[in-house]
Amino acid sequence: MSVIEINGQEKECQIMSEQDNIAVVQKAYNNFKEGNIQGLLDLMPDNVTWQLPEIQGVPFAGKRAGRESVREFFVGVEANQETLEFAPREFVAQGDKVVSLGHYRWRVKSTGQEYSSDFAHVFTVSDGKITGFQEYTDTASAARAYQRSAAA
């Protein structure tokens, strides 16, 4: 722990290196891959923000605020699609930001359709916790997979 001064008051805080922040993100991904959603949520404060693009027909897309809302996001992901591939491949960190570049592939349970995309995930990490997340991905591919019927 380190003590820093903020607005004339001393505050204890944990100074995290960029490599420490990458390790937090990698731990979160490992929890997700193992289905350990509680372990993933334990890496977030109560006031976490979680942002995916709005995608027509995708019930769990959009912005969420708070750990319970993020839990609902992961319940929605599990209820609506099957993970076929989830591969974060590169991690770049600067300050409190960690960017993960990777690729994933999903099957939509209601339509049977698959979609895949490269992604960029931008995490904000503070004191060893993920305080923010934003995803950049191929939204058109996901929308098509959710809108097609299995017979189409």
Where does each model-flagged region fall?
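Short beta-strand edge/turn micro-motifs at domain boundaries
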Residues: A120-R144
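Short, low-complexity N-terminal intrinsically disordered segments enriched in polar/charged residues
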Residues: S2-D46, R148-A152
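Short, solvent-exposed coil/turn segments at beta-strand boundaries
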Residues: N47, Q94-K97, F123-I130
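A solvent-exposed, acidic/Ser-Thr-rich amphipathic alpha-helical stretch
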Residues: P45-G95
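Hydrophobic/aromatic beta-strand elements that line small-molecule binding cavities or substrate pockets
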Residues: F74, F86-F91, R105-W106, D118-T124, ...
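A short hydrophobic beta-strand element
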Residues: D96-Y104
